[in-house]
């Protein structure tokens, strides 16, 4: 069996490492460096350059040189972060047929995973050249705050590059592995990993525990910003240079793609120099030209000026740290070590801010450029079975949830969630005086429960009679470190509960998982339509219920004509809801119609409420009813309507 390599697929730079025995080896690429720029250039002769060669020619080929593509991976074109980048990047960011953000080079439309695969292919070749044998398996890292689509897109990039991705792991966790296995300190330690890379920021609170001679790494919490990194710091310098040049020369460089590419290189260089020096000079001769001749750029920037330009960006990293500490249930003083990861953490202002927040100096014995790849290689060794003294927590491969009103799959735990994990949600009944509910547990990515795998079902009985929506049933999903799923349901009023145990990880074969992913892609549009239809039906049902209730209480205050109009509209909506072939537009039209004709009913209720002023609770209830009668959507109050069937007792 070949070695499983560890790859840090970064926004700005990438790195590959392997384990040789218990020693880690960060592998030099063909240019002799241990990190490779995540830059890809598409040339006129169809040649593709990756890394340093691509970076060297970027000034003369800006439209076809792609960098920071990781910021687009797994994202929709309409997302505000993508829209922001469109105006900043010299290359074209376009909308794919499926609505994703893609890029264009030489007129060819390229998906971000396709572009990232070129970098992964270079990492694969780097490892193969060193080992002298084929490499087919890898552990690839992603920011801890990446969502499911971003993780899946990264996995797709690996597959396109000819790699079987054995695991997608979080960058801070990988850095913690690299740090933890290198230390001799005994006992449990809580560490904070502050990861400020080229395009993303993460902070994770991780507990390293010694369990019977094994090292267990448990992520207590994570937070971050997937659109904040060194690229944003560079952009601040670029904007400053453009502004100063415009003041001095009256020329706007922001529309000149060749000049922008030179400015980007100069900004990155200046930023690095200011990490060790107090001042740097940016000197770019022949940056542009106008009628009066060529223009040269010469500008001095001090460290203080740079810090002023990026102060708010550094500050933006502190709130996620605060949230991560709170979510982990620890105090800042409980943190034993602070690890810095990512090249941007070399900036003195960043180190100073981290020290100020955590109250201690960050560790300097971790290489911020290589730690993540090293951790990925360690996990690769664990997955291959060659290392037994490390206990890593698994992830659930597909989302887990329950069926709710309208046959919708309501996800409780998303795929790629690190386990053990626990999640609870309060649901309610769908009918008045419903005495029992059935909880159906599903696994899969489809929006409608029927398209997913039913793992099991159980009943919760003995619910006291009450109007629909009043009982509070808390459903809890709990996945332990063994990947075993425990599902419980509890009536919060009576304390009655029922539980089942499901082995989630053994619930599906790899073939089924692959088929589900294919199905989800093929049927995404159809699923979305069904989901929208279910939402409209739920809205219609709720409006029928609240309008009937309001008519019972206030109908005698209406004119005969008004009451008849409401009853006719009510009947019309009920009929369309009974019609299984009715589409979303037909239901929405009837909902809107009932909303309009019941306006008067809402006014009567409001007037009655004003007149009576009979206690805050009664007033609130009437106002809620008025909102329904007026056609407004009922506020959920954190209680999700769920469809549970009555369980008949023999």
Swiss-Prot record:
One of its GO terms (molecular function) is unfolded protein binding. InterPro entries: ATPase_NBD, Chaperone_DnaK, Heat_shock_70_CS, HSP70_C_sf, HSP70_peptide-bd_sf, Hsp_70_fam. Keywords: ATP-binding, Chaperone, Nucleotide-binding, Phosphoprotein, Stress response. Pfam families: HSP70. Induction: By stress conditions e.g. heat shock. The modification Phosphothreonine is found at residue 200. Acts as a chaperone. Belongs to the heat shock protein 70 family. This is Chaperone protein DnaK. It comes from Burkholderia cenocepacia (strain HI2424). The lineage of its organism: Bacteria, Pseudomonadati, Pseudomonadota, Betaproteobacteria, Burkholderiales. The gene is dnaK.
